Amino acid sequence: MVDYSPGERRSQWDRFGNKVSLLVVLLLLTTTVKAWASDQIVVPERIRAVVAAPDRSEADRALDPGRHPAEMLAFFQVSPGLRVAELGAGGGYTTELLTRTVGPNGVVFAQNNRLILERFAEKPWSDRLAKPVMRQVVRVDREFDDPLPPEAHDLDAVFIVLLYHDTVWMKVDRSKMNRAVFQALRPGGIYAVVDHSAPPGAGLDDVQTLHRIEEKTLKQEIEQAGFELAGEADFLRNAADTRDWNDSPTAAGERRGTSDRFVLKFVKPSGANPKPPAH
């Protein structure tokens, strides 16, 4: 046994203490990263019941494995009584999940523009809106530059799911769109964004050919409107995705639902002044 002097023992203890402190810091950082990545999302039973509802269509259920609706609703904190909106609702897969979750005391403003309705969605959208479960949905036919009506204010959340990239090739003024969303949300309200990931450096190059957008570019655009990034989730990530194929619903075929997708939670800061859309 080595007999250290008091000074040497103190030095040894200091080094040990430094190592312990470093270990604690690393553990805290690891915990923070896990919370930020949201790889352990707790799904409330009420949300599981929404997804498992027996009157949901078989077509919607077939999309569930590739969309993880329970995790999405839980991550974005959708609950009964909320006022929410969806931009680019399309045929209404996400809209129906939202209205089932917010329930009879909530409301969902569901927007489509003319192009989406005329080319893809009018028939399935109208058919879905006729279902009794959709009675809390307000149909909104407006362009993306000014997507929400005046009555859509103090919203708890606004969703745009797998569609932000389309607003690029549709020549939408995205700066104006994002400011309109900012204005419609209450302080602390959530801008919920899900989209297909393009490789680093791609920027906006793949928005029409591959229906993908670079995550960094999208973050920059939304943060410029005044939003703060409050969280990310990885339940739609796929590291095996080569990100060089077209993942649009009509082109993806059997690969639909397997693309690498980012899930981002932006928040309107509490006390933020409204930022009206530019005219």
Walk through the language-model features, giving the residues of each:
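Class I SAM-dependent methyltransferase Rossmann-like catalytic core
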Residues: 47-75, 79
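S-adenosyl-L-methionine
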Residues: 120-149
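A short acidic, Gly/Pro-enriched loop at the edge of an enzyme's catalytic core
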Residues: 148-158
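Conserved beta-strand signature within the Rossmann-like core of class I S-adenosyl-L-methionine
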Residues: 188-196
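Core SAM-dependent methyltransferase catalytic element
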Residues: 240-279
